[in-house]
Each structure stands twice: as structure tokens, then as C-alpha cells.
Amino acid sequence: GVSEMDMWRIIIQIDPTLERGFKVACKGSDIRLTASDDKQMLWLQYQLIKKISKEDPRIDGSDLPPALINLNDTCGSFAFDYQSIYSPYGLNPDQTGVIGLNNFDDSWGIWGHNLRKVLGKEAKKVYATIHGKTDDSQLCFSSENMYRQIESYIVDNFGEKGNSRFVIAPDDAPYACTCATCTALGNTEKNATPAVTELIIRLSQRFPKHFFFTTSYLTTQQVTDKQLPSNTGVIVSAIDYPLRRTDGKDEQDKKFAAQLDNWKKVTNNIYIWDYINNFDDYLTPFPILKIAQQRLQFFKQHGASGIFFNGSGYSYSSFDEMRTFVLSSLLINPELPVDDLIRSYFNQEYPVSKKWLYDYYTELENNAQSGKRLGLYAGIRESEKAFLYPDQFIKFYDEMGDFVSEAKGKERKKLHELQTALSFTRLELGRDHGFDAYGYAKRNGKEIQPVPQAQKWITQLKEHKAFTGMEYYNESAYEIDYYIKEWEQYLLSSDIKKSLFLGLNPSATPKLNKIDSKKLTDGTHGLPGDYHCGWVVIPGEECTINLPVKGINASGTFYISFLNLPRHHIYAPQQIQLLKDGIAYKTIDLKPEDAPEKGEMIKATVPADLNGAEQLSIKISCLKKPEAQIGIDEIAFIP
């Protein structure tokens, strides 16, 4: 047997009077843990196991993340009442309790704009009245029927006693219901706050043990003038609060602070819905940690009591485990040093590659402190401008193979997974850089030739099938396999082998920036499956592009290709006119499909003789549609 001398004695006590708090008291091998609720106690127990495992070889804590507390008398409190992270590691039910998060899937009886799921077929009975007509794009929140349906949903699924949270939010549409009852409550055309508030107060009185939240977003952006009951609150979306370094002092900071301060007058329960990913590209690293720390300190200062970090959901996202560990630590204490948290995670999980990973990732974080905005819906070029400096990234990517070979077991698998994901970033940088030093191709006179490495990047990305959650690369569920297929089809086996326009500098009306105008003649197709990939998008239903063709003196085929993607208001043209030195020369008529499922490439060609010509003008016109744009990827002249 084991003598008492060799045992740890641990006493556990839940004390609700400790506000959000926890306490550790140590006396030799006697340890007393006190916490204000189950969630903190669970977290505290895992912290303790991790700490003891460092001193006592009988206890294995290797599968637990680094601990934030020490084995001495200590006390503290969680910065927020509610914290969840919508990312693979943050949604893993085996991990949430360990890192002090609320389990998102269990926390909410109704979430976001999901009220319609609850209403089901009955929704049609509670459609809003907009401009005097029944309108299925929005719901009526003063309807007795709506109240009854939510009431029975709660009684049937959650009972009276539990403490679940429910979001009661209008649909993601700009108009509010203005039926007689809603109008009498105070609704106006774009403000649904009065009716929504009334419903929430009524539900909170009917179910005093549950919590009910409105949102501060679109039609409920306006703060109510009523004091809200203690079991109600608001979720404030930070979508319009730019994601960049903040010191709380610029106009955008003040604007967001004012919104929080106004809600603080009517409720103590203010949750923030903030963002931690680029939703158009989950695979390229997104250095959000230092920015998130500044935002958390700012939110806390202005009364926030809960945080929901919206990430990549169940889809793989580069560095997710490390980022989720750091963010969950900052949600407990926003003052913890970010670099130390990153280091402790890499040191534990990546024994071979820890320094190399730490150096590169913190370099990204420091790049993102330049003050440039991080794009929530960004293509590779925007990421490159903000933080992804190509020379740093390519060096890191090229060194990965050695670390994958050297590492073993779990570390090797994780590095291999990261290498696969970052092959997408390498392909995107290569595609965007065309035939320059970082590009996928080399130029040889009027031809471009893909470099042999490009095939390696693709082969590496194809391994994504071996990893969970790596089927899609963005929120719109764009498939990696489809991306690879288009890459092979349009870039590796391009139909433009040689173009006499290669490298010409076109000018355009409306005016284009230098990078965009070069894209038109870089011999590199865009990928129709993703409008971020290589398309020059020009606003309006007409544009003219002028090419300096003096000295070409040849006849051949004029070639131009367009993106047809009506879903994003990008329309292929109906007509293209060519003018030689200002004189009408040729006309091409096109009949693009109305609604292709995915983006499609539309090509137009016509024989042309440019002997003696100095300027070729291309006049492009599409159907007159609201918000129309024209997407072009390549203009070529094939001898």
C-alpha cells in the first residue's frame, strides 16, 4: 500500500459567494480548492492535475495543456461569465472543461438567427408586415403565436428549471415588422428593438431560471430605453469594429465603446460576438492573438460579461489548437503575456520544432501589429499586405519538410497536417505572384512556364484527405479538391501557351490600380470557383481597356476571358467591341448563362490583325443590373 505520507489530499468546495472566483490553498501535500461554480472547479482540478504531474511521476498530465496557475496559495477570478470559441479545438467536448470554456453546443437553446428552426412550418403564421404587406423575409415579434411557440419549445426541450440561454433575434434582413401591434410598441421601418424587447421581458418572467438575449445588429442595433430583467441580456456583434491593433482611442474604438456603454445602462449581461478567422480562407495563418488580447481588455473595460469567438467551426484552421489554448487563457485573464502562452504551448506539444514554430508565428503576430486591418473576408493579396510577408512565409514553408521528417509521433502528424494546409497558402501566393520571384511560373520571352515545385505544392495539398475537417477551405464550403482541379486545369494546363500581350501595361476606365492592371496580361488565369483567385473585378456594367500594341505587328487570335458569377453580382458581358487606334474594328456578342451553380469562365476569341496598330481598345458592356461588376482575368494575343 501507499503510506499517507506519499499521498496528496485534496479538498474541494463550491462557494457561490466567490464572485466568478477560485482559490487554491496549499499546506504540504494538503490542497484546498474553492471555486464559485462547477465550470471553474472543473478547470481548477485540471490545472492542479497538470501542476502535480510535473512533480509527481505517478500522475500523467501529458495530454493536458500547460497550466496557468502555480502550486502555492493563489486566488483569482475569470474575467467573463461566459466564454466559448467556435473552432475545432474549442468545440471538442473533451477539451472545453479543461481550458475553462463553456461548451458551445450545450450552452444555447436557441442561437444566432436560428429562431426559424424552432418555428419550423409554423413560421408562416408569424411573418412580418413590411410596407403594409406580409413579408416572409422577417418575423413579427409581437405575435401571440410567436410567444406560444417559443414557450412550448422551451417547456418541451428544456423544462422550467435549467439555466439555458436563448437568443431571440430577428432575421438577417434590414427591415422590421410594422404591423399595428409592433408599431404601437414603437417599431419603425428599420428598428425592431421595441417588439423584440417586449417579447424577451415576457419570456424572462415566464422562465426566471433561463436567460434570454437580444442582439445588437441590423434592426436591433438601437438600444432599448427599458431596464432589462437580470436574466436577460444582449449579444453585440463586433463585425463593424475593424480587426486591427487597438489602444481604445481612435474613432472606431470610441464608436464601439459608446454602443457598449449604452447597453450597460439597461443590462449587466453584455456578450460580444467577435471574430478570429478569415472566413474566405481558413488555411492561411491568421495572427489574431495580440489583437484579441487588446480587444478583450477593451470589452471588459466597457462592461462586457461574455465572449463568443466565431472561428472556423468544425473545419480545420492552421494553428487552431495553439490559438484556442491562448485565447481560452486570455478569456480567463486578458492580462497574461501572449508570447509566453504561445511559447509554453509549442514547447509542450512540439519538442523538435518548438523554436522554429514560435519564431515564425510570433513574427506573424508582430507583423499584424502594424495597425493594418485584418480582413474577415480576404483574398491572399489582402493578407499579404496586412501580415503575410512572402519572403518570411516561403522560407518557413520550404523548411517544413525537414521538421516533418525529424519529428515523431503526434508532433509529426500535426506538422504534416500544417504543411498540407499551408500548401494552399503557397499555391495562392504562387498564383497571385504569377511569374515574379514568389510566383508559380517563370517567364521566357512571350511564354510562361510553371516551375516544377508548383506540382509538389499540389501533391502536398492532395494529402488533405488524411486529416479530419480539411475538406473545405472557407466558410462557404469551397472544396479543396475542386480548388486543386481548377488549379491543374487553368494554371498547369493553361490554354494560353504564348501571348504577345504578356507583360504589357494596360490602362482602363474606370481606373485600375497598378497590380490589377498587370494581372490582365500576366498569362495567368483566375480560378472560376473562387472570385478571390486571380480576377480583376471592375465596378459598373461598362468598362474600356486600352493596350499599347505598337511594335507587335502581327496577326493572330485576340483572346479575353471573364467570370460569370451572378450570385456575387459579377456578370459576363453581352458584347465586346475592339477599336484599332480609335476606329471600330470587330464586335463579339456573348450569351452567358443566367445562373450557373458555381462561377464559370466565359472565353471570347476573334481573329485580329495588329499590323501597324498603336493602340487596341476593348469596350466591354454587360446587362444593366443593380450593383453589376465585370470580372476579367486575362487578355491575350495568340500568334
Language-model-detected regions and their locations in the chain:
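Catalytic domains of carbohydrate-active enzymes that cleave complex glycans
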Residues: 330-520, 524
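Disordered, acidic Ser/Thr/Pro-rich linker "stalks" and the adjacent N-terminal cap
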Residues: 488-555, 561-572, 593-598, 627-638
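Short, well-ordered secondary-structure micro-motifs within conserved domains or adaptor modules
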Residues: 2-20
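Extracellular carbohydrate recognition and processing domains
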Residues: 585-608
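Short, surface-exposed beta-strand/strand-loop-strand elements in extracellular ectodomains
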Residues: 569-582
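Short beta-strand-plus-loop segments that form exposed binding edges in beta-rich domains
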Residues: 618-626
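Structured mid-domain segments that build the active-site/substrate or prosthetic-cofactor binding neighborhood
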Residues: 145-146, 254-355, 359
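Feature activates predominantly on carbohydrate-active enzymes
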Residues: 17-209, 213, 233-236, 260-287
